[in-house]
């Protein structure tokens, strides 16, 4: 599959198109064919090195797509369903706490600048049925930003 890697040192000139094997989902994971990804200021800050990440990180925190494969132990998701990634996939409930804020796609873990992503199923939610993939891909970071502004 095609992916974009961020090489070191970080910088827009060091975003590189590459080929990488698609990983099969393991326990509790799903594989999603990415149909759309949206660019946020957060993604720009990662790309220029303002948020440090590992060499060859796949950027982009937000994405939408179709479930292609479901790993063992996954309940509540099926192949063919449309989903979006969650900005804080480890924050399932309750108030914000530091340990829930890790795992952000595109900086703590690989993100959505790829044809396929394999991630824990808990890091996804279904898309609104009336939204296009492009519309759905904008929800995670933007909705969280709006929520933070209200809180």
Report each predicted region and the residues it spans:
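Extreme N-terminal starter segment of soluble prokaryotic enzymes
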Residues: 1-2
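Short N-terminal binding/cap micro-motifs at the start of the first secondary-structure element
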Residues: 10-17, 41-43
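NAD(P)H dinucleotide-binding glycine-rich loop of Rossmann-like/cofactor-binding domains
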Residues: 87-151
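Alpha-helix/helix-capping structural signal
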Residues: 37-39, 72, 122, 144
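Conserved hydrophobic/aromatic beta-strand scaffold that supports enzyme active sites
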Residues: 17-22, 64-66, 116-118, 124
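Glycine-rich beta-strand-centered segment in the early N-terminal region that forms part
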Residues: 22-37, 47-92, 128-131
């Amino acid at each position: 599959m095609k992916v974009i890697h961020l090489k070191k040192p970080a910088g827009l000139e060091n975003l590189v198109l590459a080929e990488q094997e698609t990983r099969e989902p393991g326990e509790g994971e799903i594989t999603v064919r990415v149909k759309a990804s949206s660019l946020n200021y957060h993604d720009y800050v990662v790309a220029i090195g303002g948020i440090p990440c590992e060499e060859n990180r796949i950027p982009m925190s937000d994405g939408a797509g179709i479930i292609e494969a479901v790993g063992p132990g996954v309940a509540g998701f099926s192949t063919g369903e449309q989903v979006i990634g969650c900005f804080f996939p480890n924050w399932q409930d309750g108030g914000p706490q530091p340990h829930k804020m890790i795992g952000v796609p595109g900086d703590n873990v690989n993100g959505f600048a790829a044809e396929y992503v394999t991630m824990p199923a808990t890091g996804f939610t279904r898309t609104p049925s009336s939204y296009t993939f492009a519309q759905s891909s904008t929800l995670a970071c933007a909705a969280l930003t709006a929520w933070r502004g209200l809180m």
